[in-house]
Amino acid sequence: ADDELTLRTSTTWLQGIERELRRRLYQWRHLPVDMIMDDYIACPKVVHSTGLGISEDVDIRVTDQNSDIYSRQFHQQIACLQDVDKIKTPVVTYDREATEQARHVMAGIFGDILPVRVTGLKGKWFAPWDELIRWFGVEQAMTDLIDRPELVHSAMTRLMDAKLAELDQWQALGLLDRNDDNTRIGSGGYGYTTDLPGINLNPKQVRTENMW
C-alpha cells in the first residue's frame, strides 16, 4: 500500500484512531465507489460491561501469520442444564469522565481540521447462534439440537434474555445514538432513510424505536 497504511502513533488507543483514518483515506483514494465521508471525527462513549460471565475455551490453528482469521476448535462448556447458569446478565456502566478525557485529547489533536463529536452506540453486531456455538462447539451444538433440544433452547433463551437486558441498560443510560446516517447496517448497507428516527424522538435519550 506504499506506506499509506503504516501507523505512526505509539499507543493502542491512538493507533485505533489512526488506523481508521488511514483506511478511510486509502479507500477514498483508491476504491471510493459510492463512499460517504463524515464531516466530523467520532469519539465513542466509554462504556463498560461485565459481560456474559462465560467466554470461549478454544484451541486455534494459525495458517497465515499476517491474518487475524484462523481455525478454531471450541471446547464444550455447556453440557447440561445446570451449565446454563454460567450465562450471566451483563451490568453496564458509562464512564463519563473517561469519555470527556478522550474527547479533550482528540480535540487537541484535530484542532480546527475536523470537529470531534461524542457518539453513542449506533448498533452492536449480535448473532445468537454464533455466540452459542462458542460454548457448545459447532458439531456438538448441531447434535444437541436433535438429541437434547431442551438444552439448546434453554441456553438460547438465557442468552437472549441477557442481551436484551443489556440493551435495556444502554437505553436507560442514554448510550444509544441514531444510526440513520453513515453507519453500516446489517451486512453492509448505509443507514440513511426517511423512515427514521420517527416522530417520538428525544435527542438526549435515543430509543431503540428510533434506530435500525
Where are these regions (language model features)?
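Active-site loop segments of alpha/beta catalytic cores
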Residues: 1-4, 34-36, 47, 90-212
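N-terminal basic, low-complexity leaders that serve as flexible interaction/assembly modules and, when applicable
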Residues: 1-82, 101, 108-125, 165
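Generic intrinsically disordered, low-complexity segments enriched for polar/acidic and small residues
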Residues: 67, 71, 84, 187-189, ...
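Residues forming anionic-ligand binding surfaces in small-molecule and nucleic-acid pockets
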Residues: 76-85, 135-139
